[in-house]
Amino acid sequence: MTVKKRSVRSERADPGDEPFLMVLRPLVEAFFAFLRKSDRHIRSLGLTPPQFDVIVTLGDTDGMTCRELSEKTLVTKGTLTGVMDRLEAKGLIGRIPSREDRRSTIIRLTPMGDDLFRQVFPKQVHYLKPFFEGALTQNQMKDLQYMLLKLKESFEKQ
């Protein structure tokens, strides 16, 4: 008697039918389209995207530690030190010993860095605004924010 072997493929649902796949490609494509436009505009302002991220994160604050800065920016820890060195060499940030913890340093914008923040941040917001408002209503933006935060949370807890 011969036992007919069932193929493994026939026992499983087709992976191409997974519902999340209909979202995956558009999500990634939207992200890359955003990066291309945003990065190009930031570079036209005379900054690299990591430099812009650090300046905008420090803007309107009293400064923060390196650890806080690395947690609040999208800049990797390995890149952050070099970015800060270059911004400090340009006179845009300063490093001040912390009063609370002598082992810690506070990074803050210099007056020149604050002036730059006040110039470039509104320009970037003004540049990006039509892309979002031309595609989504305010309610859709709120819904999208909620969904993206849920998705991020799902990836971070697993």
List each language-model region with its residue ranges:
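A structural signal for well-ordered alpha-helices, especially hydrophobic packing surfaces
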Residues: F31, F117, K152-F155
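N-terminal leader segment of winged-helix/HTH proteins
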Residues: M1-L45, K142, K150
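Exposed, interaction-prone assembly regions rather than primary DNA-binding/catalytic cores
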Residues: K142-Q158
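Base-recognition residues in the alpha-helical recognition helix of bacterial helix-turn-helix
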Residues: R25, D53-T57, T81-V83
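N-terminal helix-turn-helix DNA-binding core of bacterial DNA-binding proteins
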Residues: F32-T76
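Charged, amphipathic alpha-helical coiled-coil/dimerization segments
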Residues: R6-R9, L35, D85-D143
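Residues within helix-turn-helix
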Residues: C66-R67, G78, D85, T105
